Amino acid sequence: FLLSLPHLASGLASLVLSK
């Protein structure tokens, strides 16, 4: 789970920035 946090965080940031 902890290892997936960076990936999820970068994914969410990408979605937010794309808007």
From Swiss-Prot:
State the organism named in the record. Phyllomedusa burmeisteri (Brazilian common walking leaf frog)
Family from the record: Belongs to the frog skin active peptide (FSAP) family. Phylloseptin subfamily.
Give any single GO term for biological process: defense response
Tissues expressing this chain: Expressed by the parotoid glands.
The reply to whether Disulfide bond figures as a keyword in the UniProt entry is no
Question: What broad taxonomic lineage does this protein's source fall under?
Answer: Eukaryota, Metazoa, Chordata, Craniata, Vertebrata
Which GO cellular component does the record give, naming just one?
extracellular region
Task: Report the domain of life of the source organism.
Answer: Eukaryota
Modification Lysine amide, positions: K19
Q: Which compartments is it annotated to reside in? A: Secreted
Q: Does the keyword NAD apply?
A: no
- Spell out the protein name for this chain: Phylloseptin Bu-2
Keywords from the named record: Amidation, Amphibian defense peptide, Secreted
